[in-house]
């Protein structure tokens, strides 16, 4: 995979990014001289829709300048690849499923609650903040250990 563009990843399901959010993202990317690569769903503001294998997704994340997402996978891939990111929180409305509970739990466990927002305009300030990935990696390691132990006990019966 050889990518020469400087890009940000927009990882969101199709239809979840509003017209106003798409316009803001497009303006933001232009200001930062970045292309917008959409993964997870086609987006109006994307310069490119990336349709790739699960194995290639992490390579795209690893090479991104930053990430905007409203998904669990977009958030955790950003963490794993040590990218600056913002997670957009969607509230549940009527029969539509929000992401607040799942993403709040993940990011609070990793002490990254400051990466969440409900307002697209917050992305620039959030993505400019440094992340102590050494600390985050230690927290992630501890949570993995607990999860593995839980699974081991359940499998042993």
Where are the regions that the model predicts?
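Active-site anion-handling motifs in enzyme catalytic cores
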Residues: 4-157
